[in-house]
Amino acid sequence: MGARMDYGKIWIDGHVHEYADAVVGPMSHSLSYASSVYEGIRAYRAKPLLLDLHLARLRKSCEIFGHRFPYTDTEIGVACAQLMQMHSVADAYIKIQVILDDSGYGFQGKECKSK
């Protein structure tokens, strides 16, 4: 088995973590039922391009799936800037992914927490 790739720092539940510390449980709703939603955003000169439109689309996807997305556009913008600074990059591809954990059960995952 190959070595796990190290992506440095990531942002989970409002906090910066080491990529190696990120864990998605094997029984998480998103892994079991492919119920995650994500948005890919390009950043140039340390500014995410059309961030407001990307986040509006992400929120709509979360609404359709019944996921909770508790962060404001400002909080996400600050997190993006913080991570780009930590990685010393100005141009980047940012992926925001919302998953449901393993705190609930059932096909719809209504009791599961969004992460």
PLM segments and residue spans:
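Conserved alpha/beta cores of soluble small-molecule-handling proteins
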Residues: 1-115
